[in-house]
């Protein structure tokens, strides 16, 4: 699984005219599921995201997690994180999970974050979404359960 994690002061997802998920201070997490991913990848990613210390403590050091600050998490599915642009100009998505598997593991990831006590909002799987955010920092972290980066 891959994730782009952004520290935000607020974020929301709109589908059509409806806001389907919105948070205040916390993390916006774009999640992509790979074709070889398993529930172990979900567990690794949920553990990493929930404990990622990218919020500043009283000394100005990045030392606090989203849990530590009682922040919120907005999770948005994004299969394009598996886009491969090494050949040509058009991305190939052959490494992305098929929709049924992608949805199941995406939902498992969200469930695991909630079990860790986090307030989690979501986008809408397979929908065309407009994501609005105020990036705080900016702080953007890339995660990959295969530890490619």
Curated annotation (Swiss-Prot):
A motif (Gly-cisPro motif, important for rejection of L-amino acids) lies at residues 137-138. It is an enzyme of class 3 (hydrolase). GO terms for molecular function: D-tyrosyl-tRNA(Tyr) deacylase activity; Gly-tRNA(Ala) deacylase activity; Ser(Gly)-tRNA(Ala) hydrolase activity; tRNA binding. It catalyses: glycyl-tRNA(Ala) + H2O = tRNA(Ala) + glycine + H(+); a D-aminoacyl-tRNA + H2O = a tRNA + a D-alpha-amino acid + H(+). Keywords: Cytoplasm, Hydrolase, RNA-binding, tRNA-binding. GO terms for cellular component: cytoplasm. Signal peptide: none annotated. One of its GO terms (biological process) is D-amino acid catabolic process. An aminoacyl-tRNA editing enzyme that deacylates mischarged D-aminoacyl-tRNAs. Also deacylates mischarged glycyl-tRNA(Ala), protecting cells against glycine mischarging by AlaRS. Acts via tRNA-based rather than protein-based catalysis; rejects L-amino acids rather than detecting D-amino acids in the active site. By recycling D-aminoacyl-tRNA to D-amino acids and free tRNA molecules, this enzyme counteracts the toxicity associated with the formation of D-aminoacyl-tRNA entities in vivo and helps enforce protein L-homochirality. Homodimer. A Gly-cisPro motif from one monomer fits into the active site of the other monomer to allow specific chiral rejection of L-amino acids. PANTHER family: D-AMINOACYL-TRNA DEACYLASE 1 (PTHR10472:SF5), D-TYROSYL-TRNA TYR DEACYLASE (PTHR10472). This is D-aminoacyl-tRNA deacylase. It comes from Thermotoga maritima (strain ATCC 43589 / DSM 3109 / JCM 10099 / NBRC 100826 / MSB8).
């Amino acid at each position: 699984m891959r994730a782009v994690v952004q520290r935000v002061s607020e974020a929301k997802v709109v589908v059509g005219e409806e806001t389907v998920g919105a948070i205040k201070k916390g993390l916006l997490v774009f999640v992509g599921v790979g074709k070889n991913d398993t529930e172990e990848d979900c567990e690794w990613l949920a553990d990493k995201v929930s404990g990622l210390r990218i919020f500043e403590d009283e000394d100005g050091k990045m030392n606090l997690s989203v849990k530590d600050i009682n922040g919120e998490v907005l999770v948005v599915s994004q299969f394009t994180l598996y886009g491969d642009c090494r050949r040509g100009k058009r991305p190939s998505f052959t490494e992305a999970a098929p929709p049924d598997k992608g949805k199941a593991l995406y939902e498992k990831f969200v469930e695991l974050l909630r079990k860790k006590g986090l307030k989690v909002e979501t986008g809408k799987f397979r929908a065309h979404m407009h994501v609005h955010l105020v990036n705080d920092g900016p702080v953007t972290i890339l995660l990959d359960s295969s530890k490619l980066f």
